[in-house]
């Protein structure tokens, strides 16, 4: 049931932005900063010690690969993973590069959740302000409401999908430490960026 927290979090953020239309950017930034700090503490206190217990000498390389991978994803998403969206132009269609990079990011975040149920809460707290900010951005860009719903529901499903795949594909368990190290790199980059930008 914990793996559904990120899904409900995105849907809650979508609903808040759609119906309540929050105006205070300061409160959103504070929520974003809290989510980044919470994610960083979960990563350092839970994920990092576990991957280093495996005594795999290449774990650091996988963490660096995760950081590099996130930098590449941000090139396409323009930093939307950490609430960084710009622009007031009108959109007639879904920004596909943003969509694909956010879905890959959310999907990979789901892998360690099956072994660390408290990480689901951290990801949910991280996804809530992102969902609010993205939905408000799309509404302001006058993107079609069906397209916004499709974008947000797909984004919401990605993290639980990553968790389910890691549970039901035993071959992935052979590479659990390596995959988790890549996710640690991704989470390090995102949480530190959120903290420094807030």
Language-model features: locations:
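Intrinsically disordered, metal-sensing/regulatory segments
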Residues: 1-198
